[in-house]
From Swiss-Prot:
Gene3D superfamilies listed in its UniProt record: P-loop containing nucleotide triphosphate hydrolases
Listed name of the protein: Immune-associated nucleotide-binding protein 6
Residues annotated as domain AIG1-type G: 33-241
An example Gene Ontology CC term for this record: plasma membrane
Annotated spans, G5: 200-202
Region (G4): 161-164
Length: 336
């Protein structure tokens, strides 16, 4: 089976008229079948790419268990589900890793919005059961809300990878969550209406593979129902799609001109340059928002750190006073 891949190493213009081709097929899609864009976000090493492979049903995204991210650009593959909808899975690099520059992140967010032509039908936050919740992950939800607005949580699904760990320990996800669940995670699950799925991306059991993907698709369908069938879009996404439509329209007009091929090529080059310039401007806008969000997160972290230090100092002072009082009482007893 072949698959439809699109990577964005530069500003590429998606074709609105291009048919779905080379799709990883369970059955042939018809032109009327809808596309559901599912974007995977999360920390490097949490298993985003492996989860994408599980959804698609074969290894299409490069995936390795290592600290350094394998995915360096947004990539997308499509699969046709047995029930009809085409699932367009968008794998992202570690957009919320602290070591990644704001410039890189902003460009990849714009690339992600380019790939999600119809809008976002689900945002999958990938967390690993094998690691503690990191500061990056705690910042991720705030960053998503700052970049896209509070409505983004209406499209959020949490996927927990390393499901085999639960099986090895004879635990359920509920057991895991009830055993000292971090406040951040409680908040995320509350905001997204408890939409969560456990993925075992290493399993060879075809039944388990199918079941976990089906559970995810049930959540995607529930989001569609709850949002009235409207995918998530924001001002930035609409501007990107309007720009794409403009370029396609002008490209068609150039093709219809009765001029030499060399002139057509020159006009198309100018059009491509204007598109790239506009995409760069949008990336700069996104970078500014991201930097402001990162600065706000850092201020909050520093405030929490200061509060903890004050609490520690206060506790130390209280303990010291208690020890001094105890010593005084002891001395009084000795005198008596």
């Amino acid at each position: 089976m072949a698959e439809d891949q699109n990577t964005t190493d530069r500003w590429e213009l998606p074709s609105a008229s291009e048919p779905v081709k080379n799709v990883d097929r369970w059955e042939l899609p018809s032109a009327s079948e809808p596309v559901k864009n599912v974007v995977l976000v999360g920390r490097t090493g949490n298993g985003k790419s492996a989860t994408g492979n599980s959804i698609i049903g074969r290894k299409v995204f490069e995936s390795k268990y290592q600290a350094v991210g394998v995915t360096t650009r947004c990539k997308t593959f499509r699969a046709v589900t047995p029930d009809g909808p085409i699932i367009n899975v968008i794998d992202t690099p570690g957009l919320f890793d602290l070591a990644v520059s704001a410039e890189f992140i902003s460009k990849e967010i714009v690339n992600c919005l380019i790939l999600a032509r119809e809008g976002l039908h689900a945002v999958v936050l990938v967390l690993s059961l094998s690691t503690r919740i990191s500061q990056e992950e705690e910042n991720a939800l705030c960053t998503l809300q700052m970049l896209f607005g509070g409505k983004i949580v209406d499209y959020l699904i949490v996927v927990f990878t390393c499901g085999d760990m639960l099986e090895d320990r004879n635990m359920t996800l509920e057991d895991y969550l009830s055993n000292g669940c971090p406040e951040f995670l409680k908040n995320v699950l509350r905001l997204c209406g408890g939409r969560r799925v456990v993925f075992d991306n290493r399993t060879k059991d075809e039944g388990v593979k199918a079941k976990q993907v089906q559970q995810l698709l049930v959540h995607v369908a529930a989001i569609e129902k709850e949002t009235g069938g409207n995918p998530f879009t924001d001002t930035m996404h609409r501007r990107i799609q309007e720009e794409a439509a403009r370029v396609k329209r002008e490209e068609k007009e150039i093709e219809e001109k009765n001029i030499a091929d060399e002139e057509k090529a020159a006009l198309k080059k100018q059009l491509d340059m204007s598109y790239s310039q506009n995409m760069n401007m949008m990336a700069l806008m996104m970078e500014r928002i991201f930097k402001e969000t990162a600065a706000a997160n850092e201020r909050q972290m520093n405030m929490m750190k200061d509060f903890m230090e004050i609490s520690i100092i206060g506790n130390d002072a209280h303990r010291k006073r208690a020890e001094e009082k105890q010593a005084e009482k002891k001395q009084e007893c000795n005198i008596l």
